[in-house]
Amino acid sequence: MDAAEALTRLGGLGTRGEVLDLTSRAALRRAVLDGRVVRLKAGTYALPETNAALVAARALGGTVSLLSAALHWGWKVRMPPKRPTVTLARHRRLPERDINAEVRWADLAAAEVVDGVTCKLRTVVDCARWLPFPDGLAVADSALRSGDVTKAQLLTAAESSPRTGRPAALKVARAADGRSANPFESALRAIAIEVPGLHVEPQFPIGTVGHADLADERLGIAIEAESWEFHATREAFRYDVRRYTAFTRLDWLVVRFLWEDVMHRPELVHAILTDVVRLRSTWRAVRAS
């Protein structure tokens, strides 16, 4: 796999080890030399848009925001932005020269900006307010996972956010969970949350066998986000096959989804989960009668 594609799958940035789980050393070296991947610090790599955001913000006299700010803070995102996002003060006009950036307008307090980037809490709430639910949830999960923001802080900030976008911010804040391992799992959970009758919990322990990426304990449904990242070795593949078999022996129905389908065909994933909930509910009702 190409190194830039690997970073896209990882959420826009990753450690050297994470990248090399998906590609080769030669491919990573070549991508860095070509400028398609940048090295942020020792052992950490990102897509070039991460640095481009600061350059664009300085050129526009604005502030790095939304997904660009999330990447700046080291959080993984569902899908890295094609162009950096910059927020300008409401009175500020765009310069006549063309700048490669998505521009939005908002008045930011001094405390909400750190070194030209929206502060961590403002970044999470902005993403929750303005981005689609899966994208906002992935950022919030990542922020919680990193320890940079707490659940209580996020809920308080969402509750006190401006009326426009507040319902979306509250939805993300209430659903956010730092146990979600990566943006792939966050995006899958965002879809599952919208399925009637399905109530999932991330990284749910099943007996002594292991953890399911997502699980509905009441219905006995285990949902797995399948990625080459975690099947890079034969032993990892064997482990997961045995784990799924053990789940089934404990009366769990295992449903597995590919990254491509979760990211690009969410309506299909939603339809499958809806069918699985219906089938499992019917089966449980028959068995109980």
What is each residue range found by the language model?
Residues 1-165, 277-289:
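Short gly/ser-rich loop at a beta-strand->alpha-helix junction or flexible surface loop bordering the NTP-binding
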Residues 23, 144-289:
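Surface segments flanking catalytic/ligand-binding clefts of nucleic-acid enzymes
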